[in-house]
Amino acid sequence: QLLAAGAGAGLSAAFAAPLSSSLLVIESIERFDAPKTAITTLLAGVVAGGVASWMFPTTPYHLINAVSPGLSFWRQAELYILFAAVIAAIAKFYSLIVPFFQRWLPTLKLSVYTKMLYLLIAAYAISLTETNLTGGGEQFLMMQGMDGTHDIRWLGVMILIHFVFTLLSLSSGLPGGSFIPTLVTGGLLGQLFGLVLVQRGVIGYENVSYMMLVGMVAFLVAVVRTPLTVIVLITEITGHFEVFYPSIVVGGLTYYFTELLQIKPYNVLLYDRMFRNHNPEFPEVEGACYHLYVEIMDGSYLDGKEVDKLTLPNNCIILSIRRDHKTLPAAGETLVPGDQVEIEMDAKDIEKLYEPLVSMANIY
């Protein structure tokens, strides 16, 4: 619970968005299965968001002026469907190219220091032309949102540069996040789509920032696959509730298209990569085992159960119990609150059995 609360508090402090930080933990980490953790995370997020708002009263995202286009319902529906389809297609490419770069860059026959030098030179070269485009790129996004360019070609080149730089950064292995770069990419794609609509005479220049905010939602939903978190987050950090309902429509459509395209969430790709690096034989080795450690909570299903009489799914076995700083053999023991139980299972079953086994040891 403290781990989840810390994750939510960090996001809340960064964006001054306590509600979306709690949703992130519930939707992405706990998968709607831990109300006590949700309450803890919400309290931590409210406190962290309150402190952040006290120290930084205003956020730059509030300065974006979002004006809804005056289009008919059906015309807006057509544009949103088209936009969601385009974003889903780009996200599909993104989900394929990022793992490719992450596999390709380490195979280069160069020392780590040489690779980092090349990345440093690339970052410096980009900074000479457009300073705010490096890093997360949020300052560049803010500039475009408040007084953006009308040049589609120039914006397209900037998006391409930011995209390539993000790929190299994510593949370098250096510490850093992907959330802000993804947010910026979505916003710039929304601006580009808006400028194309302006060129076609569909909307006015004053509506481009509106499309930018919707683009943030769409691309984050497509890449991260946490629609509730993203929709609430963009609404919270921008303060533009007029974008809330379009975000629901576009976010829902984008999520549907990503399901059709079978796009794997980026967080899952990162986790799989990290897990493979630490467990290179998993799960290709036939009969490989995985050891899961859970703590028994008071009132849970496993509380008070005798290990010898306990039947676990898919031939899972309790190997040992950690109690009072001592490791005990599981045979003949009765589980009590506070026990840390070691469960052995087939490695191939970890994805489908993890949540059920954790639920048996916890109160949800």
Task: For each feature predicted by the language model, list its residue ranges.
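Alpha-helical transmembrane segments of multi-pass membrane proteins
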Residues: Q1-A9, M158-F163, Q199-A218, I231
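Hydrophobic alpha-helical transmembrane segments
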Residues: L2-L3, A38-L43, A77-L82, A89, ...
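Membrane-interfacial segments at transmembrane helix termini in multi-pass membrane proteins
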Residues: S209-L213, V217-Y293
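Cytosolic Rossmann-like ligand/nucleotide-binding regulatory domains
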Residues: D298-D349, L353
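Helix-loop-helix hairpins and the membrane-proximal interhelical loops
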Residues: I97-Y205
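Core mid-bundle transmembrane helix pairs that form the ion/substrate translocation pathway
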Residues: I39, L43-V46, M55-N132, Q139, ...
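Short, non-helical or kinked segments that cap or interrupt transmembrane helices
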Residues: Q1, F15-I39, S172-L189, I203-M212, ...
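Transmembrane alpha-helical segments of multi-pass membrane transport proteins and ion-pumping complexes
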Residues: A9-S21, G45-T58, A85-L96, L120, ...
